Amino acid sequence: MGELHRVCKNFTRHDKKTRTILLCEMLEYTNVFLEAAFRAEGYSFETLKNPVKDRTLALRYISNDYCYPTVLILAQFLEYLESGERDPEEITFMEPQAGGACRAGNIYNLLQRVLYRMAEQGQTEYAQIPVISLNLMGEEKHTGFRITPGLLSGGIAAGCYGDLIMCLYQQVKPYEQNPGETDRIRSQVEKKLCESIRRHRNGRHTREKNYRYACEVFSKVPVKPGK
């Protein structure tokens, strides 16, 4: 592992200006708000939206003893690399790290190892991709990434808004009278809440105001009689 850490690249202040941070898709309703939170702090940030087509990509580098979420997450990163959408020098991978004993909690380290093995097999450019650990424990520090109070408050707002939109959307969508109306409202609410995050208005008072706004707008979606 010592050799591995010498290969894995540090995410520098210069990288913050030139690289896009890519996070695997885990929380559909929260992703759009996370993107707003990171961008508000000056990061170029995206969540991967490519659906996993071939999970066996991950099994080239890890055994099938790993849990299914681990396989899917690694496969999504690997499929993105194979797509050639961006040059390896333009991207950074980010992975939440729980730091526990569960294998899923150590996907961060596993992703580093996979990139290292790919570099060993001749794809040396992949060794230059920084991998950022998203955690609150101060592990795996990078000189160009820091969880600031602004990023933390934006992340909290993102989590709260994501859960709220999920509940409202799933309660209304199956019973909408006009097909597509709930999706339109969801997009409208997400746009307003993202703007609030981008303006660093993440305090409790503002969040509660936004909760009421979202509930009010969704409540006006026409639903089928009796629902």
Regions found by a protein language model. Name each.
Residues 1-227:
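An N-terminal assembly and electron-transfer interface module characteristic of large anaerobic redox
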